Amino acid sequence: MTLLALGINHKTAPVALRERVTFTPDTLEQALNSLMAQPLIQGGVVLSTCNRTELYLSVEQQENLQDQLIAWLCDYHQLSPDEVLKSLYWHHGNEAVSHLMRVASGLDSLVLGEPQILGQVKKAFADSQRGHSLSGELERMFQKSFSVAKRVRTETEIGASAVSVAFAACTLARQIFESLTTVNVLLVGAGETIELAARHLHQHKVKKLMIANRTRERAQVLAAEVEAEVISLADIDERLAEADIIISSTASPLPIIGKGMVERALKKRRNQPMLLVDIAVPRDVEPDVGKLPNAYLYSVDDLQAIIESNMAQRQAAAVEAETIVVQESSDFMSWLRAQSAVETIREYRAQADEARAELEARAIQSLQQGADAEKVLRDLAHKLTNRLIHAPTKSLQQAARDGDGERLQILRDGLGLE
């Protein structure tokens, strides 16, 4: 049995190819069934995200399997091998195990250390469980990878620092305000960055969340998810004073929040401080706002400096994380090799039990026929000894005849001979 991992990701393939090799939730069950129908495949997991598509497999043997799997992948997605081969990577054994551990820990992600990938790996694992496509070895490998990812998060600082604009904005807010549960937040816009910020702030249980957007319908979808109030862009001037934190990211060519608007809001707030985080390019907040007392304005460039500093911290943490992966993958492979001996041990024990039972039955029969008990006992011990040492004796003799000193020493060690 061999463990394999093959696939493409953001480092090896452009998005134009990645999107053509994606397995959608609607097609995943069919894909797993098709994959498991391939010769020599004992178990399979399909991991498909926007940045990677990977197959994790346990196979009877790996000889000639690479061409078979590439052909299956290309046939399934109606691609030619030439389109895929240059972007495909292939790992087996310890390399496959360590690759999965790195993926689950966020060490192979576009954003180093990002936590979302672990949830995606767990979902892929659960999908294979439901589809009954997991082998025992694959199940153990994935469970081990989950524990390694948890250990990496616990023992290193891989996830402690913000490395996305949205997360950096929220981290900045948490640094300035002791608790987000007492603050009101106004989000301006409803794009991806604002969506991420809204979810993060919702998780930290802000007191009140407001979303202002040009398209009310889009804002309402996000607001329903994060329990926010939707307001129009025209309402910002009137409602700005309610906000302790403003995070803005729109595509407006002109500023939405001007100096006069913030001055009026601060007056209503009796000069209680406001944090304004302007992520937009062009800027949503007039730069002169930053000159106002009690108005703390940060631009996307300010956040980028935080992100770059934090990325350096994550890269240092990644070195520690890689050490954990090396150790854990080695431990897993040792366990896997030990498992290969389990069946042999079981067969050897069964063989010994069979010999014991046969000779024991004969001895009991002799005793029942009145034979001398001491003679029967000695005869049983002699015959059982001969049965048990017969195969090892033949192996020792053959190794000696072949002049194979290394095999002879292995046999001696196995038999406990000094």
UniProtKB/Swiss-Prot annotation:
Binding site for substrate: T49, C50, N51, R52, S109, E114, P115, Q116, Q120
Residues annotated as the enzyme's active site: C50
Gene3D superfamilies in the cross-refs: Glutamyl-tRNA reductase, N-terminal domain, NAD(P)-binding Rossmann-like Domain
Pfam (any one): GlutR_N
Keyword field: NADP, Oxidoreductase, Porphyrin biosynthesis
Function: Catalyzes the NADPH-dependent reduction of glutamyl-tRNA(Glu) to glutamate 1-semialdehyde (GSA).
Family: Belongs to the glutamyl-tRNA reductase family.
Record comment regarding domains: Possesses an unusual extended V-shaped dimeric structure with each monomer consisting of three distinct domains arranged along a curved 'spinal' alpha-helix. The N-terminal catalytic domain specifically recognizes the glutamate moiety of the substrate. The second domain is the NADPH-binding domain, and the third C-terminal domain is responsible for dimerization.
Protein name according to UniProt: Glutamyl-tRNA reductase
